[in-house]
Amino acid sequence: RLSRRRVYSIGGRRRRRRRRSRGRRGRRRGRRRGRRRGRRRGRRRRRRRGGRRRRR
């Protein structure tokens, strides 16, 4: 965080807006992908067991 604050103060208002938008988009994409992978693995195992029992 310290390095980013220093860059903002040097860059000014224009660079602040552009860099913040890119940082937020990149962070959201990375977090969503990581969380989806973990949840999908857990749900797949549970769905296979529950789905087979319910269908039979």
UniProtKB/Swiss-Prot annotation:
Residue ranges, annotated region (Disordered): 1-56
One of the record's GO molecular function terms: DNA binding
Location of the protein in the cell: Nucleus; Chromosome
Source superkingdom: Eukaryota
Gene Ontology cellular-component annotations: nucleosome; nucleus
One Gene Ontology term from the biological process aspect of the record: spermatogenesis
Modification after translation (UniProt): P2 is phosphorylated in immature sperm. It is dephosphorylated in mature sperm allowing a stronger interaction with DNA.
Keywords recorded for this protein, A-Z: Chromosome, Developmental protein, Differentiation, DNA condensation, DNA-binding, Nucleosome core, Nucleus, Phosphoprotein, Spermatogenesis
Main location: nucleus
Keyword DNA-binding in annotation: yes
Record has Transit peptide as a keyword: no
Tissue: Testis.
Function, in words: Protamines substitute for histones in the chromatin of sperm during the haploid phase of spermatogenesis. They compact sperm DNA into a highly condensed, stable and inactive complex. Octopus spermiogenesis is characterized by a double nuclear protein transition: Histones are first replaced by P1, which allows the chromatin to adopt a shape that is not as relaxed as with histones. The majority of P1 is later replaced by P2, forming a compact chromatin. P2 is the main protamine of sperm.
Entry protein name: Sperm protamine P1
